[in-house]
């Protein structure tokens, strides 16, 4: 690796360790020529699939565009940036796991909706209203009904337990 101080190619790795939960390698290096020390970070470069837009054109995956769309949906909602970054990471991992070189842009939109459904239901409805181009209030109602039917319901064990005992005795 080229020394950033003197430009010589002759450097030596002094220390290496994993950082960012194993996603990066941090290396301390020393230049053999000028003796300066510097740090480098290595990250695996993974090729993201290209996105096929509805008009048939192809576009490179743009993580910033994905992030901005999610941030717009969660605006003024109690969702942390860490949660957004985790959602983005999950979407990217799912994209890569498909093994495809190209995916319809619709795939990304659906993946965002799936993540927003986990993060914040209001953000989900906001995103869905733009993504699916809601025309009237009934489409909002349908999205909310879908959310309610897919959300995990907590059993009311205290109320249902005595009733089931009464039914068993009858």
Curated annotation (Swiss-Prot):
Gene encoding the protein: nrdR
One protein family per Pfam: ATP-cone
Zn-finger (unnamed) residues: 3-34
MF terms in GO: ATP binding; DNA binding; zinc ion binding
GO biological process: negative regulation of DNA-templated transcription
Domain ATP-cone: 49-139
PROSITE patterns: ATP_CONE
Stated family: Belongs to the NrdR family.
Region (Disordered): 151-170
Highest taxon, organism lineage: Bacteria
Source species of the chain: Marinomonas sp. (strain MWYL1)
Keywords, sorted A to Z: ATP-binding, DNA-binding, Metal-binding, Nucleotide-binding, Repressor, Transcription, Transcription regulation, Zinc, Zinc-finger
Biased amino acid composition, Basic and acidic residues: 160-170
Cofactor: how bound: Binds 1 zinc ion.
Function description: Negatively regulates transcription of bacterial ribonucleotide reductase nrd genes and operons by binding to NrdR-boxes.
Name this polypeptide is given: Transcriptional repressor NrdR
Cofactor: Zn(2+)
InterPro entries referenced in this protein's UniProt entry, alphabetically: ATP-cone_dom, NrdR-like_N, RNR_NrdR-like
């Amino acid at each position: 690796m080229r020394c950033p101080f003197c430009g010589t190619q002759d450097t030596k790795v002094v220390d290496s360790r994993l950082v960012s939960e194993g996603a990066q390698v941090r290396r301390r290096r020393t230049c053999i020529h000028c003796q300066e020390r510097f740090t480098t970070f290595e990250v695996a470069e993974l090729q993201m699939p290209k996105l096929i837009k509805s008009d048939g054109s192809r576009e490179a995956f743009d993580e910033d565009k994905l992030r901005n769309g999610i941030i717009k949906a969660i605006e003024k909602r109690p969702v942390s940036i860490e949660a957004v970054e985790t959602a983005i990471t999950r979407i990217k991992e799912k994209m890569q796991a498909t093994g495809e070189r190209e995916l319809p842009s619709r795939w990304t939109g659906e993946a965002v909706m799936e993540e927003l459904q986990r993060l914040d239901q209001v953000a989900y409805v906001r995103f869905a209203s733009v993504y699916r181009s809601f025309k009237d209030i009934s489409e909002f109602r349908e999205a909310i009904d879908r959310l309610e039917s897919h959300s995990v319901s907590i059993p009311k064990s205290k109320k249902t337990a005595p009733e089931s005992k009464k039914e068993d005795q009858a």
